[in-house]
């Protein structure tokens, strides 16, 4: 059993169309490095819901990356549509990891009314981690260590958190990032992808959106590729 936690924002107490973002980096941030603050969307007449995915931020359970998102997306959509503040319309937004959470769900899940993944990937090989068979070393390890640092923080492993931070700030992770991932997040996606990229028989996973979802209005700006 686990509980998913989200923050809601709207300007008045009445039913509104919902804008939903599901992300692993802390719902307080809400991707505001690239998107307007949720209060801006709320001022335009939306109920904005920013949710921490399973095992991240305030949500319970263990974080296992993309593998958990189809079932949790379905549950979240059902919950959002049941909110008294929701008028029945649901749109999703966010890029990168937040983009993929918009596209995968359990079979039979009703689609949202519109989808805005902006820039994301489906193939964990070609879209998320490698170029021409070569692993995105700087990007992949840096992102993996970001998630490993969040894991250490959640577990109150401050020694590990400080070691990861020092390596990121000094750029030492470019040399010993593989060892840090093995030490602090061996089950994480980045470490698994790194090892798969050097395997002679890699078993890469490609995520497949439901056909009914792809018939809905969808805004994809950067294509099926995530080099962010």
Predicted regions and their residues:
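Conserved alpha/beta-hydrolase "acid-adjacent" motif
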Residues: 227-228
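Catalytic cores of eukaryotic secretory-pathway lumenal/extracellular enzymes that build
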Residues: 50, 59-62, 99-102, 111-117
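Alpha/beta-hydrolase fold nucleophile elbow
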Residues: 84-97
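Cap/lid segment of the alpha/beta-hydrolase catalytic domain
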Residues: 12-82, 129-130
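Single conserved hydrophobic/aromatic residue that forms the stacking wall/gate
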Residues: 1-11
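Accessory cap/linker subdomain of secreted extracellular hydrolases
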Residues: 35, 43, 104-108, 112-213
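Short beta-strand/loop motif that positions the catalytic acidic residue
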Residues: 220-222
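Loop/turn elements at helix/coil->beta-strand transitions in domains of secreted/extracellular proteins
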Residues: 15-18, 44-47, 86-89, 110-114, ...
